[in-house]
From Swiss-Prot:
One of its GO terms (molecular function) is nitric-oxide synthase binding. Residues 15-27 have a biased composition (Gly residues). This is Nitric oxide synthase 3. Belongs to the NOS family.
Amino acid sequence: MGNLKSVGQEPGPPCGLGLGLGLGLCGKQGPASPAPEPSQAPVPPSPTRPAPDHSPPLTRPPDGPKFPRVKNWEVGSITYDTLSAQAQQDGPCTPRRCLGSLVFPRKLQSRPTQGPSPTEQLLGQARDFINQYYNSIKRSGSQAHEQRLQEVEAEVVATGTYQLRESELVFGAKQAWRNAPRCVGRIQWGKLQVFDARDCRTAQEMFTYICNHIKYATNRGNLRSAITVFPQRYAGRGDFRIWNSQLVRYAGYRQQDGSVRGDPANVEITELCIQHGWTPGNGRFDVLPLLLQAPDEPPELFTLPPELVLEVPLEHPTLEWFAALGLRWYALPAVSNMLLEIGGLEFPAAPFSGWYMSSEIGMRDLCDPHRYNILEDVAVCMDLDTRTTSSLWKDKAAVEINVAVLYSYQLAKVTIVDHHAATASFMKHLENEQKARGGCPADWAWIVPPISGSLTPVFHQEMVNYFLSPAFRYQPDPWKGSAAKGTGITRKKTFKEVANAVKISASLMGTVMAKRVKATILYGSETGRAQSYAQQLGRLFRKAFDPRVLCMDEYDVVSLEHEALVLVVTSTFGNGDPPENGESFAAALMEMSGPYNSSPRPEQHKSYKIRFNSVSCSDPLVSSWRRKRKESSNTDSAGALGTLRFCVFGLGSRAYPHFCAFARAVDTRLEELGGERLLQLGQGDELCGQEEAFRGWAQAAFQAACETFCVGEDAKAAARDIFSPKRSWKRQRYRLSTQAESLQLLPRLTHVHRRKMFQATILSVENLQSSKSTRATILVRLDTGSQEGLQYQPGDHIGVCPPNRPGLVEALLSRVEDPPPSTEPVAVEQLEKGSPGGPPPGWVRDPRLPPCTLRQALTYFLDITSPPSPRLLRLLSTLAEESSEQQELEALSQDPRRYEEWKWFRCPTLLEVLEQFPSVALPAPLILTQLPLLQPRYYSVSSAPSAHPGEIHLTVAVLAYRTQDGLGPLHYGVCSTWMSQLKAGDPVPCFIRGAPSFRLPPDPNLPCILVGPGTGIAPFRGFWQDRLHDIEIKGLQPAPMTLVFGCRCSQLDHLYRDEVLDAQQRGVFGQVLTAFSRDPGSPKTYVQDLLRTELAAEVHRVLCLEQGHMFVCGDVTMATSVLQTVQRILATEGSMELDEAGDVIGVLRDQQRYHEDIFGLTLRTQEVTSRIRTQSFSLQERQLRGAVPWSFDPPTQETPGS
């Protein structure tokens, strides 16, 4: 990461490669040769290796102010540093003196001021920072930007200071590292983990935060960059300060002869620790305790728990005697005495850490004469001639010491980077910054490492040194001068007191970390199941984190850059698309750019559909950046989401060709953008074991997050606890409260479904099938009253909110053990335990349902017909009085295969489950809190507003079937049965959901092929009505369309036959073909058969030669078979491979010329679904045994035929 210098005690103590933050953070301690003046440096000898041909071109800035001209003498490239014009502070140099080689220029030290900062000065700095922040999130000039500026200005005027929001603090800390001119490792600036400790009040709390920081950053040797920010400086109050220059340092003991045992750089802080009660050792590598100071209090001494401090014994790969020298060094370089400045606010305690560059240890810490000074000892052991410098004994010994450091750290699996890799990464960082910001502040004297100077590329690079804000700044030691207020020596603490402090800190570590590690849980849901899972995940993560659960459409994607942990639970809608409330999130995620896909090659700008919904599933870009990611290291750019840890769970059905496609897309994009995946993608198949899959994934995700953030020592127990039925719902934690008069139905439906509802009324309901048919398909005509919210275009969907059947509701009410009065509106209240710093314990209303009677809830808001989930069965098992029923319910809830077979065979409603298990009690609060919501039913609109203004038509198949192989009870479709019984004037709650990807092309001259068997013809009725309007009212002559329809029998269910023939005669259709699957005396034919046998040439011509469109509407099985057929047609007619044809369809989808409107499983798909379920069971059982990871990409997508 960057090279860090520790500062504050004497010039020169090197700090490891920590964050490489601050002004003195690199591999140089004393001054190197001053950097040549830009554009005036002497020409070095010609390079021995040819200049790379990828050097950036010379680009002159626009006319105006003169900018520094910066040359790379190795390759000859020239750039102009325009960013330097934004420098916030003059450097230490004067017109007559260059002070660039001073380690601590007084002018650059931040000192406490007497009294508050001048208001105008602070306001100027605050405005500049707020502007930087909103520019970074691409919201500059927005209403939120202007409002935030006003808030800050008002706060500064009223109080003399202001508070940063957490996202602003994260941005500011990262920018401070990015702006640090002496840091060589800044390419990783975006990966800095920021811990907000601004709520800290005491030195004891400081120590707890610091212990957590060390534990997180050390990460068992896989070091992670981090910063912990303590409260800011306030006028008239002392500061929070860490007296140690680094969190981990070795003591230096002054001997009687004047020599030092240990690290000479730390003699002063060692003596201060002894004065404050520390009992010293006498070793060369004794870890110092910490001296921590709260405002206006004397410093307190804290000993670091030994298990927190990771150390590396040093040995050499070939010099066996090297290990006998007894050398060691600590893993974590953590600078702790620099000041963080953000927007004029100063944070005097903000320890930050990263990892070492090997030369910091091997050259500076071990070889400097004023440090451990082992150079000559090693040279003697190597039998080198130390009598003359011409033998280069110092250089030879230094190289071997550096080899030993690298070898030892790598052997111990502790993060470290060599100086060649670090400086090469800095050159890449310079290039990145030149493109992004027009320059990069850099101090040549500190960037060039203390070994191999001209062998590194930075030696030949001119640099411009200037100072931007936010920044890390030097500050005086707290025990010196004006900073020493309140630093009096306190009495020595006894060993018992010190030990107790460590014990208390250890017990608080997890609590404090949990309080500050925030987790964002995002869900995208069509039916509410993903939302339910997200809420369960929130309850689980509350055991060790500070979680919030948000719908995707409530979340600003730019916030991802400032998140530490994000969990995503999302469904996939239709043909692999995002759910409606995830569409904006998906679009914003696709627009973001990442470290591995930032080049402007066209294939890297593929849309969501072509990248994640293509038929061939081939995406060379994914394999390309994954390869780069595997090859990446700590010297590569971190990407926009460098600090993000994430995991994703997808809900879907393997009956669909793009199973969990949106979840895979989110998982892929988050990794592409630089995020770190904590757990492989989890996938839950609604056809089998979805809840079990989620439960296993959630527990694994929780454990992985706890390990990553060093919290939740009892993670496994907490996960088991949250999913225990006895823990997840307790009778005594819920109660019903009487409410005032409840709202009308439409506002309540709006509350439940989070979208505005409208009321249409029935004009007519007409059966479209023959009276001889045993089935029914109805044409429903609705009067919209010309409401603006019910305006639509042909191809859009209408969502209808049906009630449950009254008989079913009454039967269920009779089973409730404690029903409230039937006419009394009630609400559920839950007893919340409360939490430290949060609201106190008390009864809190459950916001899921509005106030309503129990009958209204069961009628309009709760799903009582879907089979109960395993989780609900587990709850019911705890309420069963008969032990046999309790055992059976528990077995069903725990055995995924048994549950799925039971659900598939019986498809039981809640009432049927209660009839099967009659001893189960049914409390009213359980019904109101645990039953899923009754979801809207979606239908394609079957009309055109131009033909029927103020009306919406629906084509609905009325569903009725018997379970248990035809021998069970008769089940009815909730919405279709209800609508079939409606009369003229009856109200219908509904809303419009646009389908912009399923609309006729704006150019009516483009040819179109429409494929829709059964009720799949519904949207096409709106298409032909719209085209008839174009022909007869507008006088247009659009290209005739081709319709491919399918039904069972020409005499029973040939829907809209007369309308279609009329439209054909009037020029809407050029061809109309019908496939009959059960027509007496005719072979069984499906729509895909007609495409293959009758329309192959036309399909190829329309799609590949004439820029035409193809529309497919129907159930998933039919749509998949049509897709396969079209793919084979394109391969055959276009003389291409099948995979190439798949890629062509992917392009057609991306261009919105291949359109699909797919609805769910139908009874016709039972055979196909059974086969998919069997395969899914096998996969899930392997997963539960650990044979496959929690995330799996299916080897092939199932594409069942019809």
